[in-house]
Amino acid sequence: VVARRQAPLIIGLGEGEFICASDTPAIANFTNIILPMEDDEIALLTPLGIEIYDSNNERQYRNPVSLKVSEQIIDKMNFKHFMLKEIYDQPHTAKNWLETYLIQNLENGQYQIKYPFDTNFFKSIERIEIIACGTSKHAAMVGSFLLEQFSGIPTNVYYASEFRYSPPPLLPNTLTIGVSQSGETADTIAAIDMEIKRRSQIKDKEFRPNLIAITNRRESSIGRQVSNIIDICAGIEV
């Protein structure tokens, strides 16, 4: 029996075995098929298979997920340690990210951003709030400066841990951006969930939740929580 509460948990489906871990690197060498669990769920692992129940004891059904090839390759190459490898990977990672999201117009030579989701809701946005923790908040602060400079839209950055207990007043036509490298930051997940719930209680469409998540793990908790995902394409974290 395994249970998840406010921390990530995945179940790996191996050959004649189940493997439980908090993240994919721990099981990547044993299986490439995983079953992510949601918060407050309990799983029974038996010789006949897996049974998942929510906090109301209702049976849950979902399909397993296949790991990307890059997530199964954990090799520090010829570097002394993974941190050094990741530092030297930064130019390639930045190039990969730019090539993924910036498309050049051959007629005028200008670049346009290619979002992996429908951006029609951008038209009504009047303010932006960014929720993050740690170094993600540092990146968010730089991002808020750029957003205000290029879009002219007022942008505020909040510590997710503070946002949870002292949220700003609800304002209409707000874009909420959650930033988490791992996609498993507990405070950021809780803050996004709270923002979704408090905005969903208001019937006025101007207060509806408009959400984007920036993460390195599309299949993470935040990736499942928010449908509009910007993947930073930095590869697996070790």
Q: Residue spans of the language-model regions?
A:
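Glycine-rich phosphate-binding loops that contact phosphosugars or nucleotide phosphates
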Residues: K123-V238
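N-terminal segments that mediate ammonia production and transfer
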Residues: V1-E126, S136, F145, Q149-F150, ...
